[in-house]
A protein has these predicted regions:
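Ser/Thr-rich low-complexity repeats and stalk/linker segments
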Residues: 134-136, 141-233
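Cell-envelope/ECM-targeting effectors and their regulatory/trafficking segments
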Residues: 46-52, 94-97, 111, 120-122, ...
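Short, conserved secondary-structure segments in the cores of folded domains
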Residues: 8-12, 31, 64, 79, ...
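Primarily a LysM-type cell-wall glycan-binding module
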Residues: 17, 23-51, 69-97
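Surface-exposed loops/turns
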Residues: 15, 37, 64, 85, ...
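Short acidic beta-strand-loop surface patches of small beta-rich interaction domains
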Residues: 1-9, 56-64, 104-114
Length: 233
């Protein structure tokens, strides 16, 4: 929680202020959020561009999703990005493939955050791409990947089946459709971990990892999560 203009009193905080716990990432791709007065699971989900069902699913200790209280710690699917020299919100959004509006909304109201000015060392909360039923926690958006890259996340899927592919920016299928299985099937959320073997060399410097399920009725893609990545040369 680096403090700077317009916040000048480092020892002063106020009710309702949003702070990030120093232990920002307890598990890869999950950041601790401290509930403040007036919060609901839905409002937290909206702020971080995710879904209340998913938040409940990645917080198994949450006995009643309709009842959360100030001071409670919840995991949210997000990473902490430290601004470096030359960064702007636009360049960060473009590099990570995360909409600028999503980044701005997640950080609005934090100490010294301004959508017009950021400086080296400031830490931004970056929501990870997710749908109601899938969150990809590794790799992060903007990661440089190669064949064998680890893929890890959380999903609520029929019979626990999750599928994935990798495309480059020219539409070439770098890693064809493969499946993996979650640790629990729907209606529960389960963890999945697998790798992304390349079937052919990318023809461009960047592309997308797709993670999704297929409809049991017609086989169509559902809950598609698209994650921007770069390819190792």
């Amino acid at each position: 929680n680096r403090l700077g203009p317009p916040v000048t009193e480092h020892g002063m905080i106020f009710p309702g202020q949003l702070l990030v716990i120093p232990r920002v990432v307890t598990q890869r791709g999950r950041t601790i959020y401290v509930v403040k007065p007036g919060d609901t699971l839905y409002s937290i989900a909206v702020r971080y561009s995710t879904h209340a069902d998913l938040l409940a699913g990645i917080n198994p200790g949450l006995q009643n999703p309709s009842l959360i209280y100030p001071g409670q710690q919840l995991l949210i699917p997000a990473l902490i990005y430290e601004v470096t020299s030359g960064d702007s919100l636009y360049s960060i959004a473009n590099r990570l493939g995360v909409p600028l509006t999503v980044i701005t909304q997640a950080n609005q109201g934090r100490p010294a955050f301004s959508s017009n000015l950021i400086w080296p060392g400031y830490r931004l909360i970056i929501p990870l791409p997710s749908t109601q039923n899938i969150a990809v926690l590794d790799p992060y958006p903007g990661t440089v990947i190669r064949s064998g890259q680890r893929l890890h996340g959380t999903a609520r899927a029929f019979e626990g089946n999750v599928l994935h592919q990798v495309f480059d920016s020219n539409g070439v299928v770098v890693s064809g459709e493969r499946s993996t299985t979650t640790s629990a099937g729907a209606p529960s959320y389960g963890e999945f971990t697998t790798t992304l073997p390349f079937d052919r060399e990318p023809t461009s410097s960047f592309g997308n990892v797709w993670v999704y399920t297929r409809s049991a009725k017609d086989g169509s893609m559902q809950d598609v999560v698209r994650l921007k990545v770069y390819f190792s040369r």
